Amino acid sequence: MNSKYTSITKFGEITNEDAAIAKDNIIAVSDGAGGGGVFADRWSRYLVNNLPEYPITNYDSFDKWVDGIWEQFYNACEEEAKKTGGLLLNKFYDEGSFATLAAAWRLPENKCRWISYGDSVVFCYNRNAKELHHSFTRLCDFNNPPYLINCKDPLEENGFRTGVFDISDDSVIFATSDALAHYIIMTYDATNVYRDTQFEVDLGEDVHAKARNSNYAIGAFGFINKDFEKVVLRKLFSGLKNKSNLERHLKSLWEKQLLGLDDYTIAIMGDQK
């Protein structure tokens, strides 16, 4: 399989504020936050398209990278906002642009470095062990406001996460925006509740949070004893070959109250060459 990505716009909307890249040894997803600021879709595209080819390994290097790219974006958007003036310009000056970021780089010696800022998520699934690892914290934390990269304001070190996955020929590395990430982690928890109590606890916390994702988590109990790879991952991965089929599948999940309404983006890293 080659590296590839696809993105589905929120049902009923025109603008997709997600962005992604998928290269041989790097994938990334960014979710532009349209609830605050302006130019969110451009900022998310700008972030993924300006990622370095070599991995970011710690907060200081992440901060240095953002510090080295934000000004060009800011100046270009400022000039455009000035043409409109008024509320748009004031909003840009006051709030700027916001986005999350999740990225992964393939390393030598069967390693993969990942970083995240916000609630976009990098995953590593081992097809032989049937195990899923990811860059996020707990399922119920999707209910919290995410950390966001702003085009003009300082970063918060607490928002940055990084780590390394051990990978093999059986590993699949992929990244998604938050609504899809919640669905994936939620259903993995449900299919593994009898294997380890930690999955039952994680899913139960989301149910009892009485937040926007709790109804989805309740529905996830229908996945108990199901084959996670078959009923969840394969359907998502096959959608990378046929966007229309993926859109129909995601709309069905949304109608069944298993998936939040959002832009949906997935990027997958190709097999080792």
Task: List the predicted regions and their residue ranges.
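Catalytic core of PPM/PP2C metal-dependent serine/threonine phosphatase domains
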Residues: 60-125, 158-168, 250-261, 269
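Acidic loop->beta-strand submotif enriched in PP2C/PPM serine/threonine phosphatases
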Residues: 13-22, 94-109, 113, 138-186
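Short hydrophobic beta-strand that contains or immediately precedes a catalytic carboxylate
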Residues: 28-30, 115-117, 174-176
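Catalytic phosphate/metal-binding cores of nucleic-acid and nucleotide-processing enzymes, i.e., regions
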Residues: 1, 26, 105, 232-233
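N-terminal entry segment of metal-dependent catalytic domains or homologous docking segments
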Residues: 1-55, 120, 153-164, 260-267
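PP2C/PPM family metal-dependent serine/threonine protein phosphatase catalytic domain
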Residues: 2-15, 79-92, 126-168, 239-253, ...
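Short helix/loop capping segments that flank catalytic or ligand/cofactor-binding pockets
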Residues: 37-38, 124-125, 183-185
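C-terminal catalytic subdomain
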Residues: 161-273
